[in-house]
């Protein structure tokens, strides 16, 4: 069985470590390069203690010396955009996990990320397989979705595309690993333990990403409000999706059936059959998105709940899912592990 060579750029963070963890059990992959500028020469286990006994060290090669079929860029936004064109020039296909290439209109990126885009003409395919599978197959550059947008979009698509709602309010709660590996006051134990903290209210960078993708469906004018919260768990995002139905002859059971039918062929989206409420613990460590808790009150307010692991379906697992599609592998290859409940 032939293998492809994979390079992971910026592997010192949590998403980089997850890429290594998941790719080591992928039968079609050879990890050829794992980079970290600050940790050059060190064993991966110096930062990722779960990656013991791997014959891999952090390196810091020149971009031109990175020889790979596919490059995963786990660099921060603003940094990734500078190097992605060089990887493409080397002949690699690139999956970028930053926000640098997620927007069709570069002015939206510049407004929300507060920096000028250095390669505005370089366009990527938005890497959410559930909506862009055919485009992903032939893409040379994939913009891997953000963690919050993944759960938010998947919880919204059926009702938006079927024009059942025109406004959505998203309340998302994320584990602290979503804030990255570098410690700060928000993720300091005395600050985040026994606490829930809303943040970036009305101005989170993932808001326009959610809006752009949902407006490609339905009427194209759906309004989206998004508020994230930091909660004292390590992994996972649970999103509660609130909307008001435009039709009063639709029941919660009808909506549940709609979701079941919409996602029936999706390997990693599981609409809970008994409409149970998704749990973070059920998806931890997995590439699955669970959807359930679909409820309708007496004023036609609809609630839909989704749960993902922010580091897997929300980042590294989804990136590998995209790689599988790009190279014609089974889409689920290397990603079949179930959640780590309890």
UniProtKB/Swiss-Prot annotation:
GO terms for biological process: L-arginine biosynthetic process. InterPro entries: AGPR_type-1, NAD(P)-bd_dom_sf, NAGSA_dehydrogenase, Semialdehyde_DH_NAD-bd. Keywords: Amino-acid biosynthesis, Arginine biosynthesis, Cytoplasm, NADP, Oxidoreductase. The active site is at residue 147. It is an enzyme of class 1 (oxidoreductase). Catalyzes the NADPH-dependent reduction of N-acetyl-5-glutamyl phosphate to yield N-acetyl-L-glutamate 5-semialdehyde. This is N-acetyl-gamma-glutamyl-phosphate reductase.
